[in-house]
Regions:
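Catalytic centers of nucleases
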Residues: 17-99
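Generic structural hydrophobic/aromatic packing signal, biased to beta-strands
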Residues: 49, 103-105, 233
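Extended, hydrophilic extramembrane loops/domains of integral membrane proteins
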Residues: 103, 137-141, 145-199
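Membrane-active amphipathic alpha-helices enriched in small hydrophobic residues
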Residues: 216-237, 250-254
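Charged, low-complexity interaction regions
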Residues: 244-249
């Protein structure tokens, strides 16, 4: 339980730090009305991704660079540019400006890109089907960029842990609250599992320590036989002292 408590505390610290950084962005209005959610996405991605790893007992994987350089994040030491645009095609086209690094898109947009590249017959975004023309344009942009990079699309396109709507200014508080609640829920579940396992192991150990019925009966029988033999030996010896041997016993002696 100590390990679980430590993992929980570490995860929540990551969320708190990210939330503070996001609130600073919101209060300062960084990025303006149209760009603020991009900065929110960077810090939220870092905090939530690291919090989830911390709860699993793993080291941090993501760092927010926050230095106005070309890369927004370092993920496992690799530079990553984060793009959260409302328009999927415009979002993809920015990849040409960052060919020295991976690109990260919102989770729901990556689901669309993945479905397109897997050749799904129907592709949806926010419950609405994309037209065949939209699907074709998305596929074309990804294939052209992949050819220039010399990589398959899944080697340079990464998915955020967050959807586009989750990093909007009016939604980010709820996003962090839900993530915090999720960590607490998992903590409660794992605590119950640990407690149940401890009780099960304790019961199994107790049961193993007890002799089974067959062993108990066998032990009782052996004990009775030994006691009976001992009593008979004493009886014969007493008769011998009285001058009577066993072959001289009468029915009354028996």
């Amino acid at each position: 339980l100590k390990d679980l408590a430590a993992r929980r505390a570490n995860a929540l610290r990551n969320l708190d730090l990210a939330n503070q950084n996001v609130m600073n962005i919101v209060n300062s209005g960084r990025g303006g009305e149209n760009g603020i959610h991009g900065f929110i996405a960077e810090f939220a991605q870092t905090g939530i991704a690291n919090a989830r790893r911390a709860f699993e007992g793993l080291e941090k994987s993501t760092i927010t660079l926050n230095n106005n350089g070309p890369a927004d994040l370092l993920i496992n030491g690799k530079p990553v540019q984060v793009k959260f645009y409302a328009n999927l095609m415009n979002e993809l086209k920015t990849s040409a400006e960052y060919r020295s690094m991976d690109m990260m898109f919102s989770k729901d947009h990556m689901d669309v890109f993945r479905a397109v590249m897997h050749g799904d017959k129907e592709v949806f975004l926010n419950g609405q089907p994309l037209t065949s023309n939209q699907v074709q344009k998305i596929k074309q942009i990804i294939e052209e960029e992949s050819n220039i990079r010399g990589l398959s699309w899944d080697k340079w396109m990464q998915s955020s842990v967050l959807k586009y709507d989750q990093v909007q200014r009016e939604a980010i508080d709820r996003t962090f609250t839900e993530e915090t609640d999720n960590i607490k829920r998992q903590t409660s579940e794992q605590k119950s599992e640990i407690s149940n396992k401890a009780n099960t192991d304790k019961a199994a150990a107790y049961h193993k320590a007890q002799p089974n019925l067959g062993e108990a009966n066998k032990a009782a029988g052996v004990g009775a036989a030994i006691q009976g033999g001992l009593n008979f030996g004493i009886f014969v010896y007493q008769k011998h002292e009285e001058g009577k041997e066993i072959w001289q016993f009468t029915a009354e002696d028996w």
